[in-house]
């Protein structure tokens, strides 16, 4: 299921420092496919990765390594990596937690667009009330149990 139906976005990005942005984005598919299938599909995978990278606004940074990217750019790279497998659901763990409020809002706008345009379900963990109120539904947990379920305003 992971790497097919689910994409993961982490607070701390988890980009591989020795790989370029493009290589980080295609890494999940390199793991998914056998060597034979990888080589047969590599051109299509490369084209799809570039399309996604451009969609998240990083087309000009495609050959850069994570150390050459800002926090917001690294989070956009992580989102691109999560999208490469064409998941139905994105699981986002504090995707704005390491970002300033302006960049965090840019990431939220990008995620909202993905939800609306691509009909992706996004399940997000956050402690930030300003971020939570942008969701369609808010589920609050306490001590590992569902406390409330509300439609957002």
Please state what every model-predicted region is.
Residues 38-40, 150-153:
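Short, flexible cytosolic linker that couples an ABC transmembrane/permease module to its adjacent nucleotide-binding
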Residues 143-151:
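Conserved switch/coupling elements of ABC/ABC-like ATPase nucleotide-binding domains
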């Amino acid at each position: 299921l992971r790497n097919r139906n689910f994409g993961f976005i982490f607070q701390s990005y988890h980009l591989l420092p020795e790989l370029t942005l493009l290589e980080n984005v295609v890494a999940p598919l390199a793991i998914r496919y056998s060597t034979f299938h990888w080589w047969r599909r590599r051109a299509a995978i490369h084209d799809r990765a570039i399309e996604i990278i451009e969609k998240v606004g990083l087309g000009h940074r495609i050959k850069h390594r994570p150390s050459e990217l800002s926090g917001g750019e690294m989070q956009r790279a992580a989102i691109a990596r999560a999208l490469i497998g064409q998941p139905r659901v994105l699981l986002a763990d504090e995707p704005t937690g390491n970002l300033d409020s302006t960049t965090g809002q840019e990431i939220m706008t990008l995620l909202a667009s993905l939800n609306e345009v691509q009909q992706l379900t996004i399940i997000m963990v956050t402690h930030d009330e300003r971020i939570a109120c942008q969701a369609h539904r808010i589920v609050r947990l306490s001590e590992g149990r569902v406390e409330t379920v509300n439609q957002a305003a």
